[in-house]
């Protein structure tokens, strides 16, 4: 294996590790320290500041009005919709369920791409979709049978599925413009729209967030910073 392939595999492993830790860490602060809506708003605002700051140093790119609308819908589905459903799922289900159901994202992308972009679905792809969907349904039914609060667990798992679907829609509808603009340009506009969309529910919950109050501590702040 070449050096570049080793670096590529290492980057993928590091990315999966970072995202894998994100869910259990978020579970420890939601909702005790911050509500799902406030968490989403804080994440969007922080990312907006970061990407617009980086954008000041990057080459300028003009974004067309039609593409701005595509970015807006991408922000609505992929960032606000996916993140709100993810944060609310933390209230009801386990990090393990969230992570396993999230593995269905490639399958959801394939189905939505077939509907929106008319991409062909082969027999192998269809078989993969059925296997993946069966696994997610098995998790939902098993967790409902094991847990005493089955209704809450059902809600959490369904929110996970909403997270998968909204994020898949985001990936599909933003695919064409991702080839025309740099990642920095797309992210700075997408997070800006996301911050504006998440502002009303997020700002109303923010004053009650204990993570920013006197009860907070550096360890909790560190967890929030990681997320």
Region locations from a protein language model:
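Glycine-/small-residue-enriched transmembrane alpha-helix faces in small-molecule transporters
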Residues: 1-42, 149-176, 197-200
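Specific alpha-helical transmembrane segments that line the substrate/conduction pathway
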Residues: 38-49, 77, 86-126, 163
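Transmembrane alpha-helical segments that form core, pore/gating elements
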Residues: 51, 109-110, 115, 148-209
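Membrane-interface helix termini and inter-helical loops of multi-pass transporters
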Residues: 24-33, 91, 140-153, 203-223
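Small-residue-rich packing faces within the transmembrane alpha-helices of Major Facilitator Superfamily
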Residues: 20-21, 45-49, 133, 192-196
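Hydrophobic transmembrane alpha-helices of multi-pass small-molecule transport proteins
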Residues: 51, 121-143, 198
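Juxtamembrane C-cap of transmembrane helices in multi-pass membrane transport proteins
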Residues: 18-33, 46, 84-93, 101, ...
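Specific transmembrane alpha-helical segments of multi-pass solute transporters/efflux pumps
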Residues: 18, 22-23, 52-102, 138, ...
């Amino acid at each position: 294996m070449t050096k570049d392939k080793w670096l590529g595999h290492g980057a993928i492993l590091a990315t999966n590790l970072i995202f894998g830790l994100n869910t259990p860490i978020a579970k420890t602060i939601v909702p005790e320290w911050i509500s799902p809506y406030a968490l989403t708003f804080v994440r969007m605002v922080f990312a907006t500041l970061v990407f617009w700051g980086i954008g000041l140093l990057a080459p300028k790119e003009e974004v067309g009005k039609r593409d701005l609308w595509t970015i807006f819908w991408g922000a609505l589905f992929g960032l606000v919709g996916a993140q709100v459903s993810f944060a609310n799922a933390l209230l009801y289900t386990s990090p393990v369920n969230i992570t396993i159901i999230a593995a269905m994202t490639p399958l959801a992308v394939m189905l939505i791409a077939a509907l929106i972009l008319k991409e062909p679905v082969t027999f192998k792809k269809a078989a993969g979709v059925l296997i993946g969907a069966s696994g997610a349904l098995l998790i939902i039914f098993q967790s409902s049978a094991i847990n005493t609060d089955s209704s809450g667990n059902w809600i959490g798992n369904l929110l996970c599925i909403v997270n998968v679907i909204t994020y898949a829609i985001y990936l599909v509808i933003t695919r064409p413009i991702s080839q025309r603009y740099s990642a920095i340009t797309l992210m700075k506009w997408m997070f800006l729209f996301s911050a504006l969309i998440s502002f009303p529910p997020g700002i109303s919950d923010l004053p009650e967030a204990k993570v920013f109050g006197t009860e907070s501590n550096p360890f909790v702040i560190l967890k929030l910073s990681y997320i």
